[in-house]
């Protein structure tokens, strides 16, 4: 496990992720697709991927989303500090519709990130709280509560670059297969 390496895990089913192009992995960044299937529970798939990942810091991302350069630099610094840490990304302020506004309010009031915000954490913290927990319609709900039981989150990082409007397919797939 490399202290500076960051593992980016893109969440979604095999069908949702099959045409997705990811940046090439390097000595500083590792990119992995979850490719959820009906053969294995989501929680076990994520636990196995995180266990086998090479990075000290893990970032769970929605399909077709990546952190911007500023966020990557901050994540690299967090990874190098080697302290238990977790947090999420801000909402993109450019897209402003009613539903997005409700999600922003919900996220700030509950202090639990939504799927389109992504979440990051250290591998050590993840396994100290027993893994992801129940992976339901709000995938980061359970794990956020577990992390809160240990430490407070970092301030949200700059918004993810989302290259699709099609995040609902991922959520519908999860709901349909729970």
Protein language model regions, located:
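N-proximal low-complexity "stem/linker" segments adjacent to membrane-targeting elements
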Residues: 1-34
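C-terminal catalytic/acceptor-binding lobe
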Residues: 2, 137-138, 142-178
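Short beta-strand-to-loop acidic/aromatic patch adjacent to the donor-nucleotide binding site
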Residues: 54-68
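Conserved donor NDP-sugar-binding/catalytic core segment of glycosyltransferases
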Residues: 66-98
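A recurrent flexible, glycine/aromatic-enriched loop bordering the glycosyltransferase active site
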Residues: 84-94, 100-121, 127-128
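Aromatic-glycine-rich donor-binding/catalytic loop that engages nucleotide-sugar donors
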Residues: 112, 116, 120-138, 142, ...
């Amino acid at each position: 496990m490399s202290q500076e390496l960051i593992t980016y895990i893109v969440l979604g089913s095999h069908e949702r992720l099959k045409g997705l192009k990811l940046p090439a992995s390097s000595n500083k960044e590792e990119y992995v697709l979850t490719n959820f299937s009906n053969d294995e529970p989501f929680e076990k798939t994520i636990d196995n991927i995180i266990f086998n990942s090479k990075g000290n810091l893990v970032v769970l991302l929605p399909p077709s989303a990546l952190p911007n350069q500023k966020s990557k630099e901050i994540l690299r610094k967090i990874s190098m500090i080697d302290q238990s840490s977790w947090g999420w990304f801000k909402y993109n302020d450019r897209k402003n519709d009613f539903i997005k506004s409700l999600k922003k309010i919900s996220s700030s009031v509950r202090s639990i990130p939504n799927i389109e915000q992504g979440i990051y954490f250290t591998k050590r913290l993840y396994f100290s709280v027993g893994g992801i927990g129940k992976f339901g319609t709000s995938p980061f709900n359970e794990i956020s509560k577990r992390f809160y039981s240990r430490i407070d989150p970092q301030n949200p990082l700059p918004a993810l670059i989302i290259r699709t409007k099609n995040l609902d397919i991922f959520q519908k797939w999860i709901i349909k297969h729970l």
